[in-house]
């Protein structure tokens, strides 16, 4: 898990997300508290439960982006789900327990990668020996068996040196590799994904591990052999236990669009995809045991972060029990023109940097001037005010419209330089921005 301090986490988030300091601080503290809890003695550690977070803010202000960036920083099992995909237990659709099953699968992949990386050095040595056995086959005795290993011959050592220096990378060899498991595609109804994955595992294990000869360049064979040898050094039972521990102690679940499962008005019939889902989420958030294919997972110490725009519904429309289990409330602010300007220039790999790089592949140089950036930000903000406010996502629409002609003609403009200033932006966008009907459909 991540050992970054809250200040370091916020600093890392600042590289990609503009503004929303309160939300960044809250998730940074929550992430650091995961590490702090693990430093306590076992008895007290069991009593410290995570303080779940509810992020409230209009669409396009950075709620989902915070989750995406947090997933990379956490170095812990992390899953992002949409609340609208689930239905109450007993009805057609996904059950909320599948969140924990998917989280366990994510943890399993993560710990497998870590275990393979841990054994990489030994795996590289073993892969090297297998390639050398193909290049210089070991001597056979009278019964056709490999003789007992002796001191490496001078020829073998010479080939080993060439192999390590990359001199043999493009040489083709034929080598036996583990055959890919038998692929069985099973169409399952919603809610039966767990049974499907178990059936697929059963069919894959029927064939056993078979070797299949393949002709490859040495550099490609080396990669596949390292993976194969590393997988042999990994203990599957230990992996399962490590994955379950990682989920229980460090797991993070991000539930997006939680406002869409709030009850709206009086309803006579069963509300299976709204209030029913909230009731099913309660035991997960409070703490229960969920059965997964890797083992039983306790959810007592999993951190839940929920987010929603709450434009139609209010946080108070959530059922009271769920409100109580999301004690930390963070409000994200709507973005201003200044925020749009910063979004266009400050983040690593900002939208303008992406467009410059894309056009550079055709030999076209694009330059955005300061007044051009300001005019783009103003246009995006103006369209948001007069039509639906979709936050920073509007910048993608406006910029795509702005560089459409350049993108189309880029292959004929090789070697040219184009400056996008306030006049260029006004020429291409003013008519659309001013006409509300046009901007509603085009921008």
Swiss-Prot record:
Places the protein is found: Cytoplasm
Xref: InterPro entries: AAA+_ATPase (IPR003593), ATP-dep_Clp_protease_ClpX (IPR050052), ATPase_AAA_core (IPR003959), Clp_ATPase_C (IPR019489), HslU (IPR004491), P-loop_NTPase (IPR027417)
GO cellular component labels: HslUV protease complex
Binding-site residues for ATP, renumbered to this chain: 18, 60-65, 256, 321, 393
Main location: cytoplasm
Record text on subunit structure and interactions: A double ring-shaped homohexamer of HslV is capped on each side by a ring-shaped HslU homohexamer. The assembly of the HslU/HslV complex is dependent on binding of ATP.
Protein name, entry field: ATP-dependent protease ATPase subunit HslU
């Amino acid at each position: 898990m991540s050992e970054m301090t809250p200040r370091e986490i916020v600093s890392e988030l600042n590289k990609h997300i503009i503004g929303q300091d309160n939300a960044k601080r809250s998730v940074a503290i929550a992430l650091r508290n995961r590490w702090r809890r693990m430093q306590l003695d076992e008895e007290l550690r069991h009593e410290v439960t995570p303080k779940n977070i509810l992020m409230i803010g209009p669409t396009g202000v950075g709620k989902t982006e915070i989750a995406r960036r947090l997933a990379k920083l956490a170095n812990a099992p992390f899953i992002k789900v949409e609340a609208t995909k689930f239905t109450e237990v007993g009805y057609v659709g996904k059950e909320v327990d599948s969140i924990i099953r998917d989280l366990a699968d994510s943890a399993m992949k993560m710990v497998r990668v870590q275990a393979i990386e841990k054994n990489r050095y030994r795996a590289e040595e073993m892969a090297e020996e297998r390639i050398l056995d193909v290049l210089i086959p070991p001597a056979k005795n009278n019964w056709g068996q490999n003789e007992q290993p002796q001191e490496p011959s001078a020829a073998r050592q010479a080939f080993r040196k060439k192999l390590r220096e990359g001199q043999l990378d493009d040489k083709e060899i034929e080598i036996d590799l583990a055959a890919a498991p038998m692929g069985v595609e099973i169409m399952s109804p919603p809610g039966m994904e767990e049974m499907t994955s178990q059936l697929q595992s059963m069919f894959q294990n029927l064939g056993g591990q078979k070797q299949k000869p393949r002709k490859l360049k040495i550099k490609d064979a080396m990669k596949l052999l390292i993976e194969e040898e590393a997988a042999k050094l990994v203990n599957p039972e230990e992996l399962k236990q490590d994955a379950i521990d990682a989920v229980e102690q460090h797991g993070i679940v991000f539930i997006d669009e939680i406002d869409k499962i709030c009850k709206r008005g009086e309803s006579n019939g069963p509300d299976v995809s709204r209030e029913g889902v909230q009731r099913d989420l309660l035991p997960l958030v409070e703490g229960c045991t969920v059965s997964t294919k890797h083992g039983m997972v306790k959810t007592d110490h999993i951190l839940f972060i929920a987010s929603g725009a709450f434009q139609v519904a209010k946080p108070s429309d959530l059922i009271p029990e769920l409100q109580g289990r999301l004690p930390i409330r963070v409000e994200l602010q709507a973005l201003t023109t200044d925020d749009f300007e910063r979004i266009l220039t400050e983040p690593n790999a900002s939208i303008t940097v992406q467009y410059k790089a894309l056009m550079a592949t055709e030999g076209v140089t694009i330059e955005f001037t300061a007044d051009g950036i300001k005019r783009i930000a103003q246009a995006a903000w103006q369209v948001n005010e007069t039509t639906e406010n979709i936050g920073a996502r509007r910048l993608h629409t406006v910029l795509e419209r702005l560089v459409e002609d350049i993108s189309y003609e880029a292959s004929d403009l090789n070697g040219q330089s184009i400056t996008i200033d306030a006049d260029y932006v006004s020429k291409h966008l003013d008519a659309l921005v001013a006409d509300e009907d046009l901007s509603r459909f085009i921008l």
